[in-house]
Curated annotation (Swiss-Prot):
The keyword ATP-binding does not apply. It holds the Pfam family CoV_M. Residues 1-20, 73-80 are virion surface. It comes from the Viruses. Keywords: Glycoprotein, Host Golgi apparatus, Host membrane, Host-virus interaction, Membrane, Transmembrane, Transmembrane helix, Viral envelope protein, Viral immunoevasion, Viral matrix protein, Virion. Residues 42-51, 102-223 are intravirion. Isolate N1 belongs to genotype A. One of its GO terms (molecular function) is structural constituent of virion. Component of the viral envelope that plays a central role in virus morphogenesis and assembly via its interactions with other viral proteins. This is Membrane protein. PROSITE patterns: COV_M. It is found in: Virion membrane; Host Golgi apparatus membrane.
Amino acid sequence: MNKSFLPQFTSDQAVTFLKEWNFSLGVILLFITIILQFGYTSRSMFVYLIKMIILWLMWPLTITLTIFNCFYALNNAFLAFSIVFTIISIVIWILYFVNSIRLFIRTGSWWSFNPETNNLMCIDMKGKMFVRPVIEDYHTLTATVIRGHLYIQGVKLGTGYTLSDLPVYVTVAKVQVLCTYKRAFLDKLDVNSGFAVFVKSKVGNYRLPSSKPSGMDTALLRA
């Protein structure tokens, strides 16, 4: 490959570049760090969505850089490593889409393409299905109602609900299985507040039950 087409930088030019762009790079890295550190669904859904976009862009950016390194490798050793890294990045990116599509088939929610987790908590509240990502594989889930505001695992889902509106079952959908949680405890603190604890009771390869009466017969279809 003709090296004359490649830009050549001296150490002085590199230092000058860092001096000119140091502030901008620092601000960008600080912004990304804050988003990644504090982007949780229990804090701010808007910040969490920005975090998901940043994480989602990481893989295509990585693939682009590894392909670039293949074309402009310094020597054969760097070329070999670049090819391996490119293959690994593309394979992982494809697996991400395969798993996300499988989870989307199971839940029908766009949260299935969340790059952070493959666990989606699903709860049917008065005929409305709420789907939210959860990071860990919990053995118990806690639903809290505070003056009509509904929270599941600290994530606010909506308002205008009471403890009597809580379902008997809550599910967590994964790529391979659907975990069912059964309500095991309910405590009413006052008229509009209380909490319930759901315990994992069953795991199977099912689709998410439909919230529509006409779709209840498809609740146990294989995904």
